[in-house]
Amino acid sequence: MQTPPVKDGPRINEDIRVPRVLLIDHNGEKQGEMPISAALEAAEEAGLDLVEIVPNANPPVCKILDYGKFKFQEQKKKNEARKRQKIVELKEIKLRPNIDIHDYDVKAKSMHRFFEEGDKVKVTLRFRGREMAHPELGMKLLLKVKADFDEIAKVEYEPRMEGRQMIMILAPR
């Protein structure tokens, strides 16, 4: 024997298999508890569908409405919620220990934009050759970045050496 396909979403009209329901009419007014047959008749008279809104209630709450319109509204709500969700990305800014003032300002402007967009920023400071002898210069630069963005960002990962580079991660406040 084959099982019927499982429908997602609320049960409508003849799919509602309970003896009594609490009915809400198409104007949103509570009609009270009644047999399912009377509720189906009322929906048919109005030319609309009987939709089970709260199936776990005792008795289940059913509403008379246009099911197509209802489904459309639900889909619209889901899409709006998805649009409002912001996926936080990790952006990377690469610096050098002996960076020029103007170059630093350009990188700072980019970081500022990333924080306004709600993204985290990974500041990577790469050392080459003899620069490895002076990690304090790198630490000084990362502490300057930390101080410059103290108002709009918090440090998520403190400055620390990893091989030939120093890394710090900042997140927007």
Swiss-Prot record:
Keywords of this entry: Cytoplasm, Initiation factor, Protein biosynthesis
Localization in the cell: Cytoplasm
Biological source species: Caulobacter sp. (strain K31)
Matching InterPro entries: T_IF-3_C_sf, T_IF-3_N_sf, Translation_initiation_fac3_CS, Translation_initiation_fac_3, Translation_initiation_fac_3_C, Translation_initiation_fac_3_N
KW Zinc (keyword) present: no
GO MF annotation: an example: ribosome binding
Entry's family note: Belongs to the IF-3 family.
Subunit details: Monomer.
Protein name, per record: Translation initiation factor IF-3
Gene Ontology terms describing biological process: ribosome disassembly
Lineage, uppermost ranks: Bacteria, Pseudomonadati, Pseudomonadota, Alphaproteobacteria, Caulobacterales
A Pfam entry, by short name: IF3_N
Function noted in UniProt: IF-3 binds to the 30S ribosomal subunit and shifts the equilibrium between 70S ribosomes and their 50S and 30S subunits in favor of the free subunits, thus enhancing the availability of 30S subunits on which protein synthesis initiation begins.
HAMAP family xref list: IF_3
